[in-house]
Design a protein with these regions (language model features):
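Glycine-rich hexapeptide-repeat left-handed beta-helix
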Residues: 1-12, 46-54, 60-62, 66-67, ...
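N-terminal segments that cap or nucleate solenoid repeat domains
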Residues: 1-37
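A cytosolic small-molecule/anion-sensing beta-strand core signal
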Residues: 21, 33, 39, 54, ...
Length: 179
């Protein structure tokens, strides 16, 4: 897996985290326990820090990047759907960022929120806790019920299990045969 230091900053990845073999992690990136970065994911901490909490999952082909000195923070139990783009944003614990959603610079997502698939969260936008935000640009559509917001935690837990299964299934090149 491509893991690169940048200007003296090295990625720090917890031993229990799983990084797909073709994910790329660069620079000032910290990834917490039981978190995962799936196939094609890119975390570029080259111009500022990226902090990924515990039990987070960054799904296939998602990109996380930052501007100078502005961090990108994912608190614990955050799910980032396939092909999402996060740019120096702060995502609260237990939130779900839908597939192909874009979170622009300095946006803040409150804990337990759902950012709908394809949504575009504007630069500097603040999405309150337990909100459903959708659209281009994203607007808060409604507050989520507590049980809806709580459902994102087991979703993140399922990805902990899936990452462990992926890790166990990896083959060395010597184990792959071609006809």
């Amino acid at each position: 897996m491509p893991i690169y230091p940048f200007q003296g900053k090295r990625p720090r990845i917890h031993r229990s985290a799983w990084i797909a073999p073709n994910a790329t992690i660069i620079g000032d990136v910290e990834i917490g326990s039981d978190s995962s970065v799936f196939y094609g994911g890119v975390l570029r901490g080259d111009v500022g820090p990226i902090r990924i909490g515990r039990r987070c999952n960054i799904q296939d082909n998602s990109v996380i990047h930052v501007e100078r000195e502005a961090p990108c923070i994912l608190e614990d139990d955050v799910t980032v759907g396939h092909m999402a783009m996060l740019h120096d944003t702060h995502v609260g614990a237990g939130s779900l960022v839908g597939m192909s959603a874009t979170l622009l610079s300095r946006s803040t997502i409150g804990p337990g929120s759902l950012i709908a698939a394809g949504a575009l969260v504007r630069e500097g936008a603040e999405i309150p806790a337990r909100s459903l935000a959708a659209g281009v640009p994203a607007t808060v559509r409604r507050e989520l019920f507590a049980e809806q917001s709580a459902a994102f935690i087991p979703h993140a837990a399922r990805y902990v299990d899936l990452a462990q299964q992926q890790s166990a299934a990896e083959l060395a090149l010597d184990d792959v045969y071609f006809d």
